[in-house]
Amino acid sequence: MRLALVAVGRLKRGPERELVETYRERADALARGLGFSAVQVTELAESRARRAPDRCAEEGAAILDAVPPGSALVVMDEGGRPVTSLALAEQVGAWRDGGRPGLAIVIGGADGLCESVKRRADLLFAFGAATLPHGLVRVLVLEQLYRVMTILAGHPYHRGAP
């Protein structure tokens, strides 16, 4: 199963980028043995349109173009629902075992995501009700992806309740 993180905007150098790379490397180290590819990170340019609806539409089209065909789509959205790490691992494992060719996780731009992206989502996911900086969301997404891998592998990293 191909793994992709699609994000609007570029992550600058700094502690967030270092953490993103740390968790990406950890996930990649477990991926092959679990039937996953290395995580491909795609950074999309932010729209320069003047109006927010136009920016949202441009970014939404770019996001959908970047998602590999047939992939399960997890969309990070403030209106999404929180999901436990175990439930996320179960869902990712079910998609993999059910023959989905890929999993794409999407982080939108500053204006959020247009409805066409949300409608395409298999899961609208939120880390909670708080608004978080995009760099931090990337860190959290990659940490959760690594945690999913450890849960599927039976690795002791995840010590939450079964």
Swiss-Prot record:
It catalyses: pseudouridine(1915) in 23S rRNA + S-adenosyl-L-methionine = N(3)-methylpseudouridine(1915) in 23S rRNA + S-adenosyl-L-homocysteine + H(+). Keywords: Cytoplasm, Methyltransferase, rRNA processing, S-adenosyl-L-methionine, Transferase. GO terms for cellular component: cytoplasm. It is an enzyme of class 2 (transferase). InterPro entries: Alpha/beta_knot_MTases (IPR029028), RlmH-like (IPR003742), tRNA_m1G_MTases_N (IPR029026). Its EC number is 2.1.1.177. It holds the Pfam family SPOUT_MTase. S-adenosyl-L-methionine binds at residue 108. PANTHER family: METHYLTRANSFERASE, RIBOSOMAL RNA LARGE SUBUNIT METHYLTRANSFERASE H. Specifically methylates the pseudouridine at position 1915 (m3Psi1915) in 23S rRNA. HAMAP family: 23SrRNA_methyltr_H. This is Ribosomal RNA large subunit methyltransferase H. It comes from Methylobacterium nodulans (strain LMG 21967 / CNCM I-2342 / ORS 2060). The lineage of its organism: Bacteria, Pseudomonadati, Pseudomonadota, Alphaproteobacteria, Hyphomicrobiales.
